[in-house]
């Protein structure tokens, strides 16, 4: 009798499990189909500014400054994001000698030309934490002595072209409205509300939560062995494009980094120092662009959407070399902290576009001014 009961219970549970799996697969198929239907081309090739964006931008500025105040370290005011640098290093960006004429735009207009640059490598968090903690990793590249009119009036005469990137191809927010909500939740210490702002399931951003979790990846072996993406789009002459900087070990001497002690708080800085300063081995990258195909789902205004390489491949426009150097000194680290990077430190040919870049224009400038003013008062 007892044996019969357990057999029937096992049979019933097996059927229930099969039904659950079937329903799960059906739900996944329906969700995938709906997502594919919603996210199909063509898309706009021009910016589309939603109503209320300016007001939301002002709210975001105040929240970003609040975060700067919260994460003040000792007597210095840090960035509201990517506060901890692994170092600022000198670099050279050489345009390909045989660059396709269609790709000769802006700072890439002259084949073979070499730009002197500064590269800042960083963790993504607003608070300096151990490198072993899961986090985004950033690269900012500042080309120097770039001729032409700068987009920002305050930048005239500085001759800079910045590329700002981090190590994931898409962002965990779509637009300014979502960014305002996300950063406000983080500033209030209520991170769960960043993706689940209310009990209304229609407001839940589960897909964006998974993007955020993927962004908070385990630490790389070295900042020099990581691929970085612009996430947001830019003009590339008359085209729209995203950028990527990827390691290019074939262009540098063969090198195997000694195993680092990842229990140390700054092991990524140590790894960079080991390669460039101790072993005197350069690091090499390629700088690539991905041009928008407006007939495919490659939107300008939604940074949570990854532009698929099957729709538009990345094309190499330049090689980036970080020569062997000494960079980890108190004076150089202070100079690194005082540097400002922004997508809007740019010439017209590489104008930032899309909502997140419009937001950056105001927020980066306001936070930079606030931070440098407060630090100058110390």
Regions found by a protein language model. Give the residues of each.
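Short, aromatic- and cysteine-enriched interfacial helices/patches
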Residues: 1-2, 37
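N-terminal Sec-pathway targeting helices
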Residues: 4-25
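Active-site-adjacent core segments of small-molecule enzymes
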Residues: 29-378
């Amino acid at each position: 009798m007892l044996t019969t009961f357990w057999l029937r219970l096992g049979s019933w549970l097996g059927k229930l499990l099969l039904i659950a799996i079937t329903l799960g697969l059906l739900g996944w198929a329906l969700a995938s189909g709906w997502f594919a239907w919603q996210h199909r081309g063509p898309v706009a090739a021009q910016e589309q500014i939603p109503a209320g964006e300016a007001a939301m931008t002002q709210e975001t500025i105040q929240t970003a400054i609040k975060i700067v105040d919260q994460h003040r370290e000792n007597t210095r005011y840090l960035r509201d994001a990517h506060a901890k640098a692994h170092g600022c290093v000198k670099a050279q960006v050489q345009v390909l000698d045989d660059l396709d004429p269609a790709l000769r735009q802006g700072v890439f207009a002259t084949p073979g030309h070499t730009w002197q640059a500064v590269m800042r490598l960083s963790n993504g968090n607003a608070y300096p934490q151990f490198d072993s903690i899961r986090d985004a990793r950033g690269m900012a590249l500042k080309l120097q002595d770039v001729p032409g009119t700068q987009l920002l009036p305050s930048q005239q005469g500085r001759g800079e072209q910045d590329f700002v990137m981090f190590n994931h191809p898409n962002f965990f927010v779509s637009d300014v409205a979502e960014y305002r909500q996300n950063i406000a939740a983080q500033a209030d210490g209520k991170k769960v509300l960043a993706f689940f702002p209310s009990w209304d399931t229609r407001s839940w951003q589960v897909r964006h939560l998974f993007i955020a979790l993927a962004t908070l990846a385990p630490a790389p072996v070295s900042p020099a062995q990581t691929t970085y993406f612009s996430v947001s789009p830019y003009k590339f002459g008359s085209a729209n494009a995203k950028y990527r900087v990827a390691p290019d070990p074939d262009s540098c001497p063969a090198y195997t980094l000694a195993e680092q002690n990842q229990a140390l708080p700054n092991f990524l800085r140590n790894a960079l120092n080991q390669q460039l300063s101790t072993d005197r081995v350069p690091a090499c990258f390629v700088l690539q662009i991905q041009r928008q195909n407006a007939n495919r789902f490659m939107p300008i205004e939604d940074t949570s959407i990854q532009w698929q390489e099957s729709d538009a491949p990345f094309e190499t426009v330049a090689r980036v070399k970080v020569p062997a150097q000494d960079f980890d000194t108190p004076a150089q680290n202070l100079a690194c902290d005082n540097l400002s990077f922004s997508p809007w430190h740019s010439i017209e040919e590489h104008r930032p576009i899309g909502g997140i870049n419009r937001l950056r224009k105001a927020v980066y400038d306001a936070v930079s001014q606030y931070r440098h003013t407060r630090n100058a008062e110390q």
